[in-house]
């Protein structure tokens, strides 16, 4: 049974967030957490927070099942574009430049591995 966590209206451009999302797509949760902890991208903090929320949601939906992070994997992760705030910046000769402050929505779905690898 899968679990989902959504982070809405994150004040980061979707392009920057997709770079971090691509790092953990399809990976086991314990490996994804290690990758995010060692990432230098600012968006990795938001992805880590949402991933922890998805794991907690999985534990909440399956109270009789004890599952470790090694048995869960990131089934799907995607970033959608959120609202864009449009601002103006004064420019030379009486003009104005438009600044687009972008935001995004992050969705993470985790599931249990069908055949866990035993060491």
From Swiss-Prot:
Keywords for this protein:
Ribonucleoprotein, Ribosomal protein, RNA-binding, rRNA-binding
| Coiled coil segments of this chain | none
Please tell me whether the keyword Phosphoprotein is annotated for this protein. Answer: no
Q: List the disulfide bonds.
A: none
* A single Gene Ontology CC term: cytosolic large ribosomal subunit
GO biological process terms, semicolon-separated? translation
Keyword Nucleotide-binding among record annotations:
no
**A GO molecular function held by the record:** structural constituent of ribosome
Entry-linked Gene3D superfamilies = Ribosomal protein L22/L17 (3.90.470.10)
| PANTHER family recorded | CHLOROPLAST 50S RIBOSOMAL PROTEIN L22-RELATED (PTHR13501), LARGE RIBOSOMAL SUBUNIT PROTEIN UL22M (PTHR13501:SF8)
Q: Which family does it belong to?
A: Belongs to the universal ribosomal protein uL22 family.
This molecule's function is given as:
This protein binds specifically to 23S rRNA; its binding is stimulated by other ribosomal proteins, e.g. L4, L17, and L20. It is important during the early stages of 50S assembly. It makes multiple contacts with different domains of the 23S rRNA in the assembled 50S subunit and ribosome. The globular domain of the protein is located near the polypeptide exit tunnel on the outside of the subunit, while an extended beta-hairpin is found that lines the wall of the exit tunnel in the center of the 70S ribosome.
Quaternary structure and interacting proteins, as annotated: Part of the 50S ribosomal subunit.
Per its record, how is this protein called by name?
Large ribosomal subunit protein uL22
Gene name, per UniProt, is: rplV
């Amino acid at each position: 049974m899968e679990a989902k966590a959504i982070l809405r209206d994150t004040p980061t451009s979707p392009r920057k967030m997709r770079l971090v999302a691509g790092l953990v797509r399809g990976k086991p949760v314990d490996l994804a957490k290690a990758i995010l902890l060692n990432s230098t991208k600012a968006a990795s903090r938001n992805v880590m927070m949402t991933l922890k929320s998805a794991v907690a949601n999985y534990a909440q939906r399956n109270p009789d099942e004890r599952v470790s992070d090694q048995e869960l994997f990131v089934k799907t992760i995607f970033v959608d574009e959120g609202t864009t705030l449009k601002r103006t910046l004064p420019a030379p000769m009486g003009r104005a430049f438009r600044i687009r402050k972008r935001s995004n929505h992050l969705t993470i779905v985790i599931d249990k591995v069908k055949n866990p690898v035993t060491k």
